Design a protein with these regions (language model features):
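Two-component/phosphorelay signaling modules centered on CheY-like receiver
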Residues: 23-42
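Acidic catalytic/metal-coordinating carboxylates
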Residues: 46-49, 71-76
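The feature encodes the CheY-like receiver
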Residues: 69-70, 99
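Alpha4 helix (beta4-alpha4-beta5 surface) of REC/receiver domains from two-component response regulators
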Residues: 75, 97-116, 122, 126
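Active-site residues of response regulator receiver
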Residues: 65
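Non-catalytic signal-transmission and effector/linker regions of two-component phosphorelay proteins
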Residues: 1-16, 22, 85, 122-168
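Acidic, metal-coordinating helix/loop segments flanking the phosphotransfer/catalytic sites
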Residues: 43-61
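A short, hydrophobic beta-strand element within the central beta-sheet of small alpha/beta folds
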Residues: 88-99
Length: 168
């Protein structure tokens, strides 16, 4: 008998995700999963490709593998922090090198969210919710109502989770 769990998925409010991952199979799995709940995923195979994407496009979340050819995750983060500082809190780091003191020290120094490979996809959803929640808390916009003059506060780019998906 298999056990199944149900996870909330976002409405069709399209979220943009930059996925930096050198492993083709893993990247395809993550991309397909995220597209199931209306995320637009752009993949970069290394930090150089990632920077090109960051310059051209805005992203709601950045999934960043730490070990990539040409330009590893820590160097990519530092470069992004310089050109688009507001993106520094949109990172979710992914690595299979849990015992590596270099990656551990870096991730701790930037207070990064981390997914240790292999990870269950619901952990990815949880991490993304955390990034979106932080973004909403930081980007609260004030709207004044014309009819009543009342002040209403609402988050920009909300990420509602009302669809449901069962993973067995």
């Amino acid at each position: 008998m298999s056990s199944s769990q149900t996870y909330d998925l976002p409405e069709t409010n399209l979220q943009t995700v930059l996925l930096l991952e050198a492993d083709n199979e893993f990247a395809a799995t993550v991309k397909k999963f995220l597209e199931l709940y209306s995320c637009r995923v752009t993949r970069a195979r290394n930090g150089v490709e990632g920077l090109q994407q960051i310059i051209r496009t805005d992203f709601d979340v950045i999934l960043c593998d730490m070990v990539m050819p040409t330009f590893p995750g820590d160097k990519f983060y530092i470069a992004v922090e310089r050109i688009k500082p507001r993106y520094s809190e949109r990172f979710i780091f992914m690595t299979g090198h849990k015992a590596d003191p270099k990656w551990d020290a870096f991730i701790r120094s930037v207070r990064g969210l981390t997914l240790w490979k292999p990870f269950p996809m619901h952990d990815l959803l949880t991490a993304m919710r955390t990034v979106f929640r932080r973004s909403r808390e930081r980007d609260v916009v004030d709207y004044s109502t014309v009819m009543t003059g009342a002040l209403v506060t609402a988050p920009k780019g909300s990420f509602p989770f009302s669809k449901r998906m069962t993973i067995q």
